Amino acid sequence: VPYISDLNDMIRMETLKKDIVYQILYYLSDNDNYDDLMHTVIYGKPGSGKTEISKIIADINVNLGFLSKGHIKFAKRSDMIAEYLGQTAIKTQKLLNSCKGGCLIIDEAYSLGNSDKRDSYSKECIDVLNQFLTENKKDFMCIIIGYEEELQKCFFSHNPGLDRRFPWKYKIEPYGPKELLQIFNLLF
């Protein structure tokens, strides 16, 4: 399977690698009849490899044919939140529709909301996303990336059903000095 070697080449992360392979095997075991959500969360500190892991997961799922169009898009707050009230739902829906058959990766997903929940733009965006996650579960994958505490406070807390839309959750531990030296040696 393409991109499995990229996953395997990641320094350390042995448990994460096994869990991702388990996720792949889960979908391969009953590809035609699965009714489960593919949506995934990747938690980790800055520089821990969250974005790289999200790309690998998306590429694997695309190459296994789980997503009909096979495209991968990256988004951030400004791609989903509009300038004027009432426009955010339209902007978010347009982005999500363009991702059908593919994977949407939202980096720093906690920036879509805030901890005091007084941002109606955020609510609009997250409500549209939440509905889309369920209605398009068979041919759409969403991967969100961010810091665990911020995602809980500023993203998942905005909608009680949102957390269960992401059944696959991976936490990347920070690299230690030994791993950083390995990475440095690979680069130079």
Give, region by region, the residue ranges found by the protein language model.
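Pre-Walker A (pre-P-loop) alpha-helix and adjacent loop at the N terminus of AAA/AAA+ ATPase modules
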Residues: P2-T40
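Walker A/P-loop
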Residues: D36-G70, K94-S98
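Short glycine-rich substrate-engagement loop in P-loop NTPases that contacts/grips substrate
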Residues: K69-C99
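Flexible beta-alpha connector loops of hexameric P-loop NTPases
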Residues: R77-Q87, S111-K123, Y170
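Conserved nucleotide-binding/hydrolysis micro-motifs of P-loop NTPases
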Residues: D79-I81, Y110-L112, Y147-Q152, P174-L180
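Conserved catalytic/switch belt of AAA+ P-loop NTPases
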Residues: Y110-E149, S157-G161
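A short helix-turn-beta junction within AAA+ P-loop NTPase domains corresponding to the substrate/partner-engaging
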Residues: D139, F155-P174
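Conserved AAA+ ATPase "sensor/coupling" helix adjacent to the nucleotide-binding pocket
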Residues: H158-P160, L181-F188
